[in-house]
Amino acid sequence: MKKVCFIVAMQGEAKPLIRHFGLHHIEGCFGSLPPQAYRASYAEKEIFLVTNGIEQETGLDYIGCEAAVLSAHLAVSSFSPDLIINAGTAGDFVSKGAEIGDVYLSNKYVVFHDRRVPIPGWDKMGQGYLPCVDPLNIISEINVKSGVCTSGSSLDITGDDLEQMKQTGGEVKDMEAGAVAWVASLYNIPLLCVKAITDLVDAGHSTPEQFNDNFLLATQRLDDVCFRLIDEKLVDKL
């Protein structure tokens, strides 16, 4: 496995990775499109990182599935990676044993929790069930958890979303993994999602408040795991 590409939504999540791996910005890599690309040779590998970019009107990071699809497609078509790592923050549940700052690796498949198409065939297509690599060989080495990543287009969650998560087994709730997984599946490129928990859905506290309060801690934990995946050559065991 020579080429690894990180797909990261937010610049705040990406900056420690850029510093650690000595990644250099590739100016104008995608023309006028928002995603930004970085590259370096590190530990006998080519490391790439693509962020969703900044929306000009607000100055904020692009988030969500649409931005993630664009970033993932541009990354794959430009760099042809051997492995995609979708690194970011996510929510989870106290009832499932999660705590703030826990890091999860995707397991089994990646799904969507807010796509409801009750027509045979399209129902499963909408939910996704997109492939990801089996992380069980490395979980014990880096003291992380594993779970099914599930994506939606909102930071909060509805009762219908929760019901679909029960049906699919989704647990680690974010806004990008499903989109990246879809692109990876089209190109038949192995995918690993690495998600650090910023908020607990059933903790009784506001999701935006939890996200803002815990983003720094979660990002530190996230990046530490991503460092180890490369530095300790754990990606070669996937």
Positions of predicted regions on the chain:
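Active-site-adjacent mobile loop/cap segments within catalytic or ligand-binding domains
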Residues: 164-169, 173, 178-216
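Glycine-rich beta-alpha junction loops
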Residues: 10, 91, 109, 153, ...
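Conserved active-site and cofactor/substrate-binding residues in soluble primary-metabolism enzymes
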Residues: 12, 63-70, 79, 175-178, ...
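Short, well-ordered amphipathic alpha-helical segments that serve as non-catalytic structural scaffolds
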Residues: 71-75, 131-135, 218-229
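Active-site rim beta-loop-alpha module in soluble metabolic enzymes
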Residues: 118-174, 178-187
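His/Asp/Glu-rich mid-to-C-terminal helical/loop segments that flank catalytic regions of hydrolases
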Residues: 201-238
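Short, well-ordered secondary-structure micro-motifs
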Residues: 17, 96-97, 116, 159-162, ...
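Metabolite-binding pocket within alpha/beta catalytic cores that recognizes anionic/polar moieties
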Residues: 1-129
